[in-house]
């Protein structure tokens, strides 16, 4: 069969046809398809010629399979060599789409740049040819599609996962830059995932040779959400623009959307040029620092690839050697090789099922008894672990007002997915809002001997009715007035059990949420579920509800607040929640102060006799309040002031 007119050029075509057969792709080896399967493929030309691709020069045929993806110029299909059974991804470009010289030059440029690249994290170029209808580029098949597919299924990835993928992208990108090639279109859809969960950089349709600064291309190209400001300003495209795009990729994987994405393209471009974006508080400090370093307006200010790899985000964070296939659709179990975590798992195994066979029943009972005793010792001293004693008479201790809180370092914080992270903006926002409201209330409050009239029918309030501090081993457990039980674990994760005890809610960070039926909790989370259940049982059996506020049915609270941070002083417990609620429990007389609502601010006071009243903060500001309540408001203000970063 004679070649069709209009082949790309003699040189690239001859190189593809020089060998008697194209190299085997990464798909099934020749032995993968045998006997009847190969006979079936061999019989297809007469029965379904539209599904066959034939190389005009060699006569080799390929069975065109499922559609893998499509772009502006081409569609990509899975293709199988009918003789060897080798599988490829074939990029099919209609001749009608490259009729103009500059369009054809673009395809030729892609082939010239890609064909000689050989790197573990670059999609392998196999061969190419064309016929009268199409141009065919045969590439390494990445059976798990692209990072875009994973992102669409998961929305956000854990930081160890992001490190895993970014290391491979950086490795491939460094190779390209060392060979003087700019990718110019780094985005999730151009990072392909193999059967073994290895990442490959692909799609070199916009790639270009690196030129001296004065000769660099000034055209605007790339995907809008990932384009660097210097490209939009037509200042030329250098390696730094690829680094910028990498920063946008990192942000998208961690946060769920690109940093500069808006509903309007012009507004997106304006944000990019002005580098206007926000860093969520849920990110770890190293992640925020690295993103801030990469997403800088001036290309000269951005870190190099080597500097990125030396950043704390990579050097101090855990990176798995390999990700499970299940991570394409669901959050994986990523347990770093940490001796403390191993000990934690060992302890929880011994306490909650999977007991060692060598232990007799008496030993097992002793272990559980020891846990109960430990819980009692750590909580009873400052907690309602027994029937309440008669309330003491007289005003609250003067020390509540005049003595600075002691031992008030944060004891637990809902953090990002790792250790050693700085306090997030979410906690800071709650603290600053409460500080501002309390200062405004107390500063103008007139003297008074009694409280104003409380609200007759306040909105139902979700508050902490019971709590257990077992942070010396596991974390801080609490029960809400809705009967939902939760634990803020020492590693910064949060798990809750619904009021009907049928649903488990897991938050690896304050912004990432997963829910499971009790019977479908992943195995990796079973130890935490065991601890949560034990806390629930303990609080149910040993602790009294801390006040007479009306109960709230959980069905009426679709998004119960998460405990962000808890702090213990020598006189009180401070709890900060994701909905802005602030609760202070005073040990000595079991009074409680709850700030909630914010628009308007509500102040709920649970007195010594367990009665609860809710007031508008504006009424307290205008009319004053009793000395008891005023002293507790001032102490709460002092606690919050110590939490404020200002």
From Swiss-Prot:
Induction: Cytokine and cellular adhesion trigger induction. Down-regulated in a majority of lung carcinoma samples. GO terms for cellular component: centrosome; cytoplasm; dendrite; Golgi stack; kinetochore; neuronal cell body; nucleolus; nucleoplasm. GO terms for molecular function: ATP binding; p53 binding; protein serine kinase activity; protein serine/threonine kinase activity. Transmembrane segments: none annotated. Keywords: Apoptosis, ATP-binding, Cell cycle, Cytoplasm, Cytoskeleton, DNA damage, Golgi apparatus, Kinase, Nucleotide-binding, Nucleus, Phosphoprotein, Repeat, Serine/threonine-protein kinase, Transferase. Phosphorylated in an ATM-dependent manner following DNA damage. Phosphorylated as cells enter mitosis and dephosphorylated as cells exit mitosis. Residues 10-19 have a biased composition (Low complexity). Its EC number is 2.7.11.21. It comes from the Eukaryota. The keyword ATP-binding applies. PANTHER family: SERINE/THREONINE-PROTEIN KINASE PLK, SERINE_THREONINE-PROTEIN KINASE PLK3. Serine/threonine-protein kinase involved in cell cycle regulation, response to stress and Golgi disassembly. Polo-like kinases act by binding and phosphorylating proteins that are already phosphorylated on a specific motif recognized by the POLO box domains. Phosphorylates ATF2, BCL2L1, CDC25A, CDC25C, CHEK2, HIF1A, JUN, p53/TP53, p73/TP73, PTEN, TOP2A and VRK1. Involved in cell cycle regulation: required for entry into S phase and cytokinesis. Phosphorylates BCL2L1, leading to regulate the G2 checkpoint and progression to cytokinesis during mitosis. Interacts (via the POLO-box domain) with CIB1; leading to inhibit PLK3 kinase activity. Interacts with GOLGB1. This is Serine/threonine-protein kinase PLK3. It comes from Homo sapiens (Human).
